[in-house]
């Protein structure tokens, strides 16, 4: 029985590897391998594929092609792209700009799937739980998407819902990342010093934690308690009666995105003081609270 399971696992891994190879070739991303000397030993992965011989060229920029490939490959790769987008100091400008679109511009899953996830979590449809519920997402990311709603008691809330079947998708792709890390570790002396296997293992632990929205709700509630007497930050309230492993419901707060300088100035916000407050908040979380929000965009 165990032999059959291992065989199926290997077949599944091979199938996924071929899908990744096909996607990278389709978007002409094999050029990234050619441009990075440390990865030259892995070029054979592309040269052996018939997909390389018959592909059509595209006029899209390399940044756009990379972003589209990550979106096609699924949530784990989108998450990786999001992580890269927060380090524009390490990336060419054109790539950094495109990857930044992954922060909140990932295609949403359908309204029908949203209703199914709510029914599965609560045992009843959305309109029996909320006074109002918009089944069309207003924001969508790699792991989950957000919906506007109103509780029966009148409070405006944000409903965050995990992508369907994301656990299975993440598990499959983690197997691939671990395999790739082992390949890099074995075939590139230059990249081996970066400890790719350990990096992927840490990344795996981080992503799996993000899949538990009850854990996220608990962290948010703790941050709220840490700042409950502050006049420079407002942390949304968590509505625990509505929180599940795959669903988080929190207070909706109206505001201006911190990167919208024009609108902030129009609202009379002191930009310099805002920056000072942001630094103060972050360092207070890190050095005093030992619990910080690591996704402050």
Residue ranges, per PLM feature:
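Conserved actuator
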Residues: 137-143, 150-152, 222
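Conserved beta3 strand of the Hanks-type protein kinase catalytic N-lobe
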Residues: 149-150, 296
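Short acidic-glycine loop/turn motifs at beta-strand connectors
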Residues: 152-154, 254
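Residues on conserved beta-strands of the protein kinase catalytic domain
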Residues: 143, 155, 245-246
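N-terminal accessory/targeting segments that precede structured cores
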Residues: 2-145, 168-196
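Glycine-rich ATP phosphate-binding loop
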Residues: 148, 155-163
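ATP-dependent phospho-/nucleotidyl transfer catalytic cores
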Residues: 93, 100-107, 119, 171-172, ...
């Amino acid at each position: 029985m165990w032999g059959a399971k291992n065989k199926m696992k290997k077949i599944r891994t091979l199938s996924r590897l071929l899908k990744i190879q096909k996607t990278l070739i389709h978007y002409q991303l094999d050029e990234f391998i050619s441009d990075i000397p440390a990865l030259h030993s892995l070029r054979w992965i592309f040269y052996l594929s018939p997909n390389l011989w018959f592909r059509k060229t595209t006029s899209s920029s390399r940044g756009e092609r990379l972003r589209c490939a990550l979106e096609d490959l699924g949530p784990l790769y989108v998450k990786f792209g999001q992580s890269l987008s927060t380090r524009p100091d390490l990336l060419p400008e054109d790539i950094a700009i495109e990857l930044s679109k992954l922060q909140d511009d990932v295609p949403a899953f359908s309204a029908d799937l949203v209703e199914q996830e709510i029914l599965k979590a609560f045992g009843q449809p959305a309109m029996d739980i909320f006074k109002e519920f918009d089944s069309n997402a207003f924001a969508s990311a790699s792991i989950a998407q957000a919906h506007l709603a109103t509780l029966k008691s009148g409070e405006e809330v944000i409903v965050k819902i995990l992508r369907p079947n994301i656990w299975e998708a993440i598990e499959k792709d983690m197997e691939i990342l671990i395999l790739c890390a082992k390949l890099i570790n074995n075939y590139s002396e230059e990249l081996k010093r970066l400890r790719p296997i350990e990096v992927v293992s840490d990344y795996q632990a981080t992503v799996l934690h993000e899949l538990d929205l009850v854990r996220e709700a608990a962290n948010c509630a703790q941050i709220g308690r840490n700042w409950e007497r502050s006049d420079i930050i407002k942390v949304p309230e968590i509505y625990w009666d509505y929180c599940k492993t795959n669903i988080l419901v929190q207070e909706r707060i109206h505001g201006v995105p911190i990167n919208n300088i024009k609108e902030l100035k129009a609202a009379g916000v002191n930009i310099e003081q805002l920056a000072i407050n942001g630094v103060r908040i972050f360092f207070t979380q890190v050095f005093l609270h030992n619990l910080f929000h690591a996704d402050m965009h």
